[in-house]
Amino acid sequence: HEGDGLMTSRSDQALVIKVADCQPILLAHNSGSCIAALHIGWRGNRAGFIQKGVKEFCQNYQLRPSDIFAVRGPSLGPGHSEFINFQTEWGANFFSYYNLHSQTMDLWQLSKDQLLQAGLTAQNIFSLDLCTYSLPELFFSYRRDAVCGRQAGIIWIKR
């Protein structure tokens, strides 16, 4: 997943993740000394990119996951994350996130659980539960419009 994550400890550099329906996940150490930004598409969720990104961030800056804050930005909500080929696209390990009736995945809950699995604490995980598909006046959505617009998740260190 080369290019799906960025990190820095420089105060003169913003990190930007551009998404349409994917999840921007912004990370910051509680001291404010280092930050990271992850682009999480469904394939990234499936591949455990959140856990890998947190691990790399912690190793690079000698951090404990429990000292990291995370914010998930607007993205495709649980009611619109349709996967009609669940078995081939996801598999049995993700069945608890799949709604068989609507054939949709709860990617928001999956990402939260993956952050917890990576060692973050529940009180340090924040979510903007705004669905890009459901709010056309606010967000681009490729799933809704088949047009490739983008919004940005931005994080920086202010000193």
Segments (PLM) and residue ranges:
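Active-site microenvironment for binding and transforming phosphate-containing groups
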Residues: 1-159
